[in-house]
Each structure stands twice: as C-alpha cells, then as structure tokens.
A protein has these predicted regions:
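Conserved catalytic cores of very large enzyme subunits
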Residues: 2-206, 242-245, 249-804
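Extended non-globular scaffold/tether segments
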Residues: 207-219
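Generic hydrophobic alpha-helical segments
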Residues: 227-228, 297
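A conserved hydrophobic secondary-structure block that centers on an alpha-helix together
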Residues: 230-240
Length: 804
C-alpha cells in the first residue's frame, strides 16, 4: 500500500484476517428473517414493543455464531461475514421484487442461493401488507400521493430502514454494564403507580427492556461457551490462551462493567453489533471513541497489561469486524447510498467539556489503526478546533495521503455554537460526535434519526416553479403554481415563484416524513437502542416516542451548486444582459440542448454565467437568498417527538446528500446552468464539476457564505487532489494552513479529501481486477470503487482536481 510505511503495517494475522473478509462475497442471508417471522407469529397478542423485545431475544438465542480463527473479538451479524440479513418487518416488497436481480445489478451487487430464495418465499406471505412500509404508506394523506408515485422525495431509505444516525451512551455502558441499566429499570418498574394511565405503557416498556438486556447477556454467554469449546480442541498454545481469554471476557461484558481496554473493546463491539441486528438502520456510530475508551487504555498502559502493539492489533481487529456488518438496500435506494455504506462513524479529537484540547495517546493510536486497516469502515471523523494538537493534525494529513478518503474534518468552531443556539446545553455541545456522514449529534442523548431522508431537489423545484407548479419529468402537478417563466417579467418574479414553490414542497416533505415516523413509532419500536439512549429508561418510553434528551431532524437538500449556477445564468444572461430570451432558454431546456442553436445557448450558460465555487459574490449571494426560503420554512415544522420530552423536536437544514446527487439527477431534466437531462447533480455543497476555476481557497470562501449556523445537519464539502500534490512537505503544510484558514477564519463546517488521480480512477473502471483495494470518498463516506455503479464512478471521476 502506497505511503503505508509511515504508520507501519498490520500484524500478519490481521493482514490475513483483513484479506479473508475482503475476499468474502456478500450474500443475502435469510436466517434473521426466519427467526423474526417465528417471533412475530408466536407473539401476535403482545404489545408491539414486547414483540420487538421477544424478537430480538429469539434471534440472539438462536442465530448462528462463530469466532474467526484470526479474530481477537467475538460477535457476528449473519451466518457469514459480509452477508446481509433481511429485515422483513420493515419491508419484503423490494426483496421479493429483486430476488432474481440482486446479482445482476450494475453496482451494490449481492449474491443469493436458491435455498435462501425459497426461505424468503416461504415467509413472504406473512409480511404482505404487514410491515413498516405498508403501514407507512397507508398513513400518507392523499395530498402527498403524487410525491410517492414519482419518488421525488426519495423516501426508500426511510420506508425500508430502521434506527439511524445516533450513537448510544458507550461511556455509561462501559462504566455500569447492562447490569446497571437492568437495576435502574427494575427500580423504576417497581415504583410505578398504575392509577396513572401512562404507567401501563411504561410497565410494558420496562418489561421489554429487561428482556433485551437478558437476551444480550445470553448472546455474550453463547460466545463465551463457544470460545471455551474451541479452546478444548485448539492445539496452538497461544491461540488456546486467546480463546480462553475471549471466553472469560464474553462471560463478563457487556453485562458487567468493563475493567480493561480489551474488555471495553469487546463490550463496545457487542453493542455496536446487536443494534444492527435489532434494526435495519445505518449510521449507528461509535461516538467519541478516544474519549470514553481512554481511561481503560491509560490504566492498562500504565500497569503494563497493554502495549502499544497489542492495542493496535486489537483496534485493527475491531475495524475489520466493523466491515463485516452489511445491509442490502433496494435498487432505488442504492441510487442515494451507493457502495453498500453503513456509515459507522468513529470520532476522535475535538475538545473536552471544559474546552481543552481532547487529543490523547489513544487518539493517535486510533488514527494509526485506521490507517493500517485502510478500509471503508469505520467512517473516521476528526473534530478540528483552533488549538488542535499540531502533531495530531500532521498525522491526519498523513492519513489523508493514503488516499482512502479519511479522515473527514468537522469544525468545532461553528458546530458547537450552532448546537448551543438550538438549545443544546454547553457541556453536551462540546461532547458532540459525527453520527454518519457529516451529521452531528450528542452521543447517548440524541433522537433516533437526525436526518430527514426526504430530499429537496433544488433544481427540480426551481424547474417546477418555472412551469407553474407542474413537474417537467413526471408531468404531474406538484404545487399550486405561481406562474410560467416565459411570463415572468423580472428576476424578482422568478424568485417569488421559487420562494412559494420551495415552501410548499418543504411542507409536503414534512407531511411524508411525519406519516412514516408515526408508522415507525408504532410498528418498529426498538427496545435496546432506546434503553441505551438517555433518558428513555427515565421517561419510560422508546426513543421514537420522545425518550431522548435531544431530538432534531435535518432535511436534506440536493443540487445546491446547480441551483446557484442556474439562478446566476438566468439573472445575468436573461434579465440583465438579455443575451438569451426567456423563451429561448425555456425551449433549450425542454430540448435538452440538442439542436445546434440550443447547444450554443448551453455553451453560453456554461461559459458566460458566474459559477458557484469561485468566490463570486454575484452567484454566491443568489443561492444564499434562495436557500433562506427553505431554511425559514423548514424550521416551522416540529417533528413527531415535539413537546413529548426531548429538547428540540424541530427541524433544520443539512446538505448531506450522500450519493443522491446521482439518483436525483436521474429524475431531473436539463437545468438552466447548462447541465444535461438526467446527469448527476452537484453533491453536498460542493461546486458543479469543473465549474470551480479559481482553486481551493475560492471554494472555501464560497462555501463559507452559506448560512452554515442554520445548516446544523451538516455542510458536506468534498475536495479532490492528486497524490502528487501532497508529495512534498511544503505542500502538506500548505494544505494544513488552507484547512486552518477555512475553519478558523471562514468558519467552514466540514471538508474531506479524495487523494487519487483521475488516471487511476479511469484505469480502475477499465481494469477493476487491478484495483480491488481502491477506496474513494463518495460523499460523507468511503466505498470500494469497484462496487459502485458506473454512473456513480463517472460522477467521482468528473470531480475537479484541486492544486495548492
């Protein structure tokens, strides 16, 4: 691996383990689905929260378990590493529709045996019209049916998925063990006054919590016995000793508190794993790993029971295990989540709650371990602040140079004040972590999905506003309509139509999300996830009922740069310079710039109009003005947990479009910026491909003009450089200074880098067998280049290569 020597290499066993996991083909796995079906059938008379608890118990007590020969940690999600379990309680629709198509996909391919197909066919009738998707769709009001039919909001990720974008309270889990949670639950249950109506529901919830804690304990004990049995027949003395130690640890954690670093790692892994067996979610993150794990690391290093080498090997094992967790999405959902990402984020760095630099020895070790494994999971985020340890920052740049898109950098200087402005307590704001792509939250205290998952496609909404409320792709009416572009006399007329249209579309997106959230609350209340999030046990309710301390949702906006460039082209070339008439532009858009005359118009739009990403106030201010309409509207709408316990319960903006720029682009005709129909939109808040001509500083200045303090859901900025650009110490220091300027002076939110050449990507597309290990940053996550669809690969290849 290029530049790998700086961080050292994996031990031989971990290198072998890594290779074994990477070589595994991802198969569809029916075991969980069969066990879940049995549990639901056996407990149809029970309240749904009890059904969910008994389902998890059934799965954890009966699923296949194994311990890999090279692993130091126990715990698996499916019958084989990288297999994707099916979660029928969410949906079976896409599974059955795509049963014979999983292996034929352009990207995100999964394999499936005939036996598995038959197992899924056998259980499918039970789940027909009896799952989250069916109930969510049944709750949708008629006025939003057109949006579901056309898929304009991209709701696949919400209809088919479980808990997402959170980190449980790992610090408390390690300190108290699940035993502490059990004792607290029993005490509160015993104190219930059943003359109070709410106590009836609390009692059921507490019973469910006790069931899942016992189930987790049983699951860990199964591994303890397995390791002991394996030790009996193991002939290698060292491995025998390791298996006996695994057995001892699994008998203890996570039920009992952890007392060593190795116990803490195993406890964290068990919880991280089981949360992704309980629920078909994603972005279930590790939180501030270097902070809550440091006391165990420090103690063991000081007493001599842990060395730097053994800690590294244990962490690299954990990250390899993290990669084994998998999820199959519908073909439609892969358009916005390409590369089978799980978004399991590990956050390091940042500040302590008393505002000091939080970097410690473990921060460096985590960085080194991620560099050694060089995988797509976990998703590593470093919290930057003005006084970040210089040596640590240097090492972050060295990891970037390895070219696998990590770490991403989030900026304390804007994120912490933004949280405080929304009502988050200062000590909690200073303890935030990344929980997915660029989204951020307070670990162990945040509601069950901080991301809305209904995309507001800005360019498509603009076209709708220009066409009196009728969508040009589907020919369906989306909004009331506020005029035709060809009849709008001034730019202000267009802006007024945009304002009303985007507000109306935002309202509809909220209706869709609320209906699905209501269905999710009633149908798939996840007990373990709730129990491990403060203060669900204290309130006696699930996370989806408002059990968390905080609960905010960020909407997702797609095509920000296309919107900016479109507005600039219209204002400058049509209304100000009058080089193009309104009718000419409209006809060219409808023609997809195909005729010779319309190709000339396209050329003018691309070459003569100001472009977002070049520090040009003309275009940058236009998009801020348009964006404010959305931000002003979205904050009006509470979520379904509002005034039910959590602080917040409201919505704010976010640009974490993941790979939805590709999928949303496929549903969007040509746009006034000169983009052709059905081509990808710009991703995140990044400029459109090759529109940024003035270098990285200009991009940073443009992005910093966005109302970042209101976009607390994340301002995702992707940048791309060739490895040669960072081949000298001088350029490395230039990049550091550039990032410091962006964060310290311009108050940028986030930045991440693809350090890979266009030539390498093109060669990988032509000769995938030569580049099996090539990892790229897609959006707020990394993926193996070869598993992406060609359209997504092309989108990444087309990004501008920056120079320093």
């Amino acid at each position: 691996m290029e530049n790998q020597e700086h961080f050292g290499r994996l031990t031989d066993r971990m290198a072998t383990f890594r290779e074994e996991v990477l070589e595994e083909k991802p198969y569809i796995d029916a075991e969980r689905a069969v066990l879940a079906t049995q549990a639901y059938k056996e407990n149809q008379n029970q309240p749904r929260v009890m059904v969910r608890a008994l389902m998890l118990q059934k799965i954890l007590e009966n699923m296949s378990i194994y311990i890999e020969d090279k692993s130091l940690i126990a715990g698996n999600q499916a019958t084989k590493n990288k297999n994707a379990p099916i979660f029928p309680e969410y949906t079976m629709e896409f599974v059955m529709n795509e049963l014979d198509l999983f292996e034929k996909r352009d990207g995100d391919v999964f394999y499936i045996t005939e036996e598995t197909k038959q197992q899924l066919r056998d259980i499918a009738p039970f789940w027909e019209n009896n799952n989250l998707r069916a109930r969510g769709e049944a709750l949708l009001p008629d006025e939003v049916s057109v949006f579901m039919e056309t898929g304009v909001f991209g709701m696949e990720g919400k209809l088919n998925a479980g808990d997402a974008h959170l980190a449980v309270n790992y610090e408390r889990i390690l300190a108290e063990g699940l035993k502490g949670y059990e004792e607290r639950t029993k005490k509160l249950k015993a104190a219930l006054d059943f003359t109070k109506p709410e106590s009836i529901d609390k009692n059921v919830f507490y019973k469910a919590v006790l069931i899942v804690i016992d189930a987790v304990h049983t699951f860990a004990n199964r591994y303890s016995k397995l390791a002991q049995d394996m030790a009996l027949t193991e002939t290698d003395a060292k491995r025998k000793e390791e298996l006996l130690e695994i057995s001892r640890i699994c008998a203890k954690v996570p039920y009992e508190p952890a007392s060593s670093f190795r116990e803490a790692v195993q406890a964290v892994w068990f919880i991280q794993l089981i949360l992704q067996i309980e629920s078909n979610g994603h972005s279930l993150s590790y939180g501030r790993f270097d902070q809550y794990m440091y006391p165990y690391y420090k103690k063991d290093m000081e007493n001599g029971s842990l060395s730097e080498e053994s800690a590294l090997e244990l962490l690299t094992c954990l990250w390899i295990k993290t990669l084994t967790v998998n999820k199959v999405r519908s073909q439609a959902h892969t358009l916005s989540s390409a590369g089978s990402p799980m978004y399991q984020n590990v956050t390091i760095g940042g500040q302590t709650t008393d505002k000091k630099d939080a970097v410690n020895e473990l921060s460096f070790t985590v960085l080194k371990s991620v560099a050694q494994t060089r995988l797509t999971q976990p998703n590593l985020t470093v919290r930057y602040h003005a006084n970040l340890n210089k040596k640590f920052f240097d090492e972050c740049i060295e990891v970037m140079k390895l070219g696998f898109g990590m770490p991403a950098l989030n900026n304390d200087e804007i994120i912490i004040p933004s949280f405080i402005n929304w009502g988050v307590k200062e000590e909690d704001a200073y303890n935030y972590s990344a929980i997915g792509c660029v989204e951020t939250a307070v670990p162990g205290k945040w509601g069950y999905r901080c991301t809305g998952m209904s995309y507001i496609n800005f360019p498509r909404v603009l076209l709708c506003a220009m066409n009196n409320g009728v969508d040009l792709t589907s020919k369906k009416r989306f909004t009331k309509g506020y005029g035709y572009f060809t009849e709008m006399e001034t730019y202000e007329d267009l802006l007024a139509a945009w304002d009303k249209t985007v507000r109306e579309m935002t309202r509809y997106s909220v209706i869709v999300e609320n209906a699905i959230d209501k269905a999710s609350e009633r149908d798939v209340p996840d007990v373990l996830c709730s129990a491990l999030t403060d203060d669900c046990i204290g309130r006696g309710k699930t996370i989806k009922e408002g059990g968390a301390v905080y609960d905010f949702i960020s909407g997702l906006q797609v095509g920000i740069a296309n919107m900016a460039d479109s507005l600039a082209a219209i204002k400058k070339l049509v209304y100000e310079e009058k080089k193009i008439t309104k009718q000419q532009l409209w006809d060219a858009i409808l023609d997809n710039f195909q005729s010779p005359e319309n190709k000339k118009i396209q050329e003018m739009l691309i070459e003569e109009a100001p472009k977002y990403g070049n520090d040009n106030d003309y275009v940058d201010n236009l998009v801020v003005e348009a964006y404010d309409s959305y931000l002003d509207e979205i904050k009006k709408y509470p979520n379904t947990r509002y005034q039910r316990g959590p602080i917040g319960g409201i919505r704010y903006g976010g640009t974490s479009s993941i790979s939805a720029n590709v999928g949303q682009g496929m549903g969007t005709i040509a746009t006034p910026d000169g983009r052709n129909a059905f081509e990808p939109l710009a991703e995140g808040c990044s400029p459109a491909h090759n529109a940024d001509k003035n270098g990285p500083t200009a991009i940073f200045k443009t992005v910093s003009k966005l109302p970042t303090e209101k976009i607390t859901g994340g301002v995702l900025l992707n940048q791309k450089m060739t490895p040669q650009m960072l081949s000298t110490e001088e350029n490395k220091q230039k990049l550091e200074m550039l990032i410091r300027t962006f964060f310290n002076r311009l108050h940028g939110y986030h930045v991440q880098y693809n350090i890979v050449s266009k030539e390498t990507l093109i060669d990988a597309q032509k000769h995938p067998e030569k580049h099996k290990d090539l990892i790229v940053r897609v959006a707020g996550y990394s993926a193996f280049f070869n598993v992406l669809s060609k359209k997504t690969q092309d989108d990444i290849i087309g990004r501008t290569e920056q120079t320093l």
